[in-house]
Amino acid sequence: MEGKEEDVRLGANKFSERQPIGTAAQGAADDKDYKEPPPAPLFEPGELKSWSFYRAGIAEFVATFLFLYITILTVMGVSKSTSKCATVGIQGIAWSFGGMIFALVYCTAGISGGHINPAVTFGLFLARKLSLTRALFYIIMQCLGAVCGAGVVKGFQQGLYMGNGGGANVVAPGYTKGDGLGAEIVGTFILVYTVFSATDAKRNARDSHVPILAPLPIGFAVFLVHLATIPITGTGINPARSLGAAIIYNRDHAWNDHWIFWVGPFIGAALAAIYHQVIIRAIPFKSRS
């Protein structure tokens, strides 16, 4: 980093890519002038000496802490009611997850990239948008934040927390493990593909409004996936969220199918990264000058 702090832009791409406002009307000229940024190095030792590196990790910790705190608290509020009409219901839970992602991505995008999810970090790493060093640091901080967030909820209302499943992800009765795995793969694919599309460097260079609006489609994707898959798995699509709730709840059934909420999201994230980079952007097929 050579003594300089560099904020990580949305999508964890620190390389400058913006073109002057107004170039969208130039059409094909944009494609000719635009150059792909170089991939992030696998290891970047200089990051470990930069305050911006640790600041980004702290931002991921705090964001994931707040995410788990609000969302698990919402789940507990719905679970304790005997009547669905007296609570916000599944729609309210979905809104709490999607709304928090919208708010937290907006707040942390300029600091850490606003990942708040190991699957998002993994997908961006596969696309070489950030180094392995940063990816591992983010995932550790996300998991720690999730554990702390779920722990605070349990501390507030332990009886309710332990009596209503603690917000832990499990495959619902009537569904197989394959159903749960498939729901997690597809749900995470939708989320990570939305992240790639909303933070695409080429679109950002062409359309100045894209970076500003990016948190909105990401949060909305989380909302829609939760609406669809809460009845199946409680919706993971975020290994840190699943791990934090499972550790604090710590009952056998929370761990029985826990692997699904790591394997599924990581497969979904990998497929989204491959689809965007290879099919949509065709980066491997572009001539290198």
Curated annotation (Swiss-Prot):
Instruction: Name the InterPro entries on file.
Output: Aquaporin-like, Aquaporin_transptr, MIP, MIP_CS
Q: What is this protein called?
A: Aquaporin PIP1-2
**Motif NPA 2 mapped to chain:** 238-240
Q: Where are the transmembrane segments?
A: 58-78, 93-115, 136-156, 178-198, 212-232, 260-280
Q: In chain numbering, where does the motif NPA 1 fall?
A: 117-119
One example of a Gene Ontology biological process annotation = protein heterotetramerization
Q: Where is this region: Disordered?
A: 1-36
- Job of this protein: Water channel required to facilitate the transport of water across cell membrane. Active as heteromers with PIP1-1, PIP2-1, PIP2-4 or PIP2-5, but not as homomers.
The record describes its quaternary structure and partners as: Interacts with PIP2-1 to form heteromers.
Gene3D superfamilies linked: Glycerol uptake facilitator protein (1.20.1080.10)
Fetch the PANTHER family from UniProt.
AQUAPORIN OR AQUAGLYCEROPORIN RELATED
Kindly state which keywords UniProt assigns to this record, in alphabetical order: Cell membrane, Membrane, Repeat, Transmembrane, Transmembrane helix, Transport
Q: Matching Pfam families, A to Z?
A: MIP (PF00230)
Tell me the domain comment: Aquaporins contain two tandem repeats each containing three membrane-spanning domains and a pore-forming loop with the signature motif Asn-Pro-Ala (NPA).
Say if the entry is tagged with keyword Repeat.
yes
Give coiled-coil spans as residue ranges.
none
Give the family from UniProt.
Answer: Belongs to the MIP/aquaporin (TC 1.A.8) family. PIP (TC 1.A.8.11) subfamily.
**Where can this protein be found?**
Cell membrane
A Gene Ontology cellular component where this protein is annotated is:
protein-containing complex
